[in-house]
């Protein structure tokens, strides 16, 4: 942790972009259920696997950049493609790019790509999601998507609507 903070302190005037991904099961909200009048329904969700819609994005201050919605789970190939084709082109000045240590993040390759475009790459210390402010955004996003599902939208359309109005 100390090393991470020392390295970060070397860039006092460089903007930081935090990047991360999250996923939402399409069975997040049930439109119909039964319970006594006036009571909420609580039920177990079956062990069945449902389709997953995932999102990867960056956050600079309170602004979300380069969001990508995709079906399924993240792979190294998809992450590199998003990083090269969406994230890096959206950064118009040098940034410190900070991300977690997920297994599918090929750190050496991501560092090389960042440096080639004039950016700095800094992974978080292991097991430190509390340092990543985009985690708070994901929590808000999931709460808002759940609210939008109550209006009859699909998870996909709720996510698209949220990013358009954010």
For the regions a language model picked out, list residue spans one by one:
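Short functional hotspots at interaction and active-site rims
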Residues: 1-166
